[in-house]
Amino acid sequence: MGRGNSCGGGQSSLDYLFGGDAPAPKPVPAPRPAPTESNNGPAPPVTAVTATALTTATTSVEPAELNKQIPAGIKTPVNNYARAEGQNTGNFLTDRPSTKVHAAPGGGSSLDYLFTGGK
């Protein structure tokens, strides 16, 4: 199968992302309050809402804005802490095992069992 070809069955390989042929759910209208018949009763108390209360309740930080603040190559900010060995040791940037040389050239190797026949 070449690149860009269908995977068969007449369906996209990305149906798991887009939901396939499932119909979109219909929006449910919000319930309306029942009208009151008399206006002779006492008026409900008016609560004073400050501008800061409105902004703090409605202001939210978008996830995209948080992602822009994290440097490239770092998945989460909790991994960014000082290490005794230095910042570029271990799997700090790439999540790959270390490539640090552990033996002197010509010395012991973890692959000796392959080349010496286990002697």
Swiss-Prot record:
**Positions with biased composition (Pro residues):** 24-34
Localization terms from the record = Cytoplasm, Cytoskeleton, Phragmoplast; Cytoplasm, Cytoskeleton, Spindle
Residues covered by region (Disordered) = 1-47, 85-105
Q: Give the record's PTM text.
A: Ubiquitinated. Upon salt-stress induction, it is subject to proteasome-dependent degradation.
Its main localization is: cytoplasm
Which GO BP terms, alphabetically? anisotropic cell growth; cellular response to salt stress; cortical microtubule organization; unidimensional cell growth
> GO terms for CC?
cortical microtubule, transverse to long axis; cytosol; mitochondrion; phragmoplast; preprophase band; spindle microtubule
Q: Does the keyword Transport apply?
A: no
The UniProt similarity line reads: Belongs to the SPIRAL1 family.
Q: What does this protein do?
A: Required for directional control of cell elongation. Stabilizes growing ends of cortical microtubules and influences their dynamic properties. Acts redundantly with SP1Ls in maintaining the cortical microtubules organization essential for anisotropic cell growth. Plays a key role in salt stress-induced microtubules disassembly.
Can you say what this protein is called?
Answer: Protein SPIRAL1
Source species, please? Answer: Arabidopsis thaliana
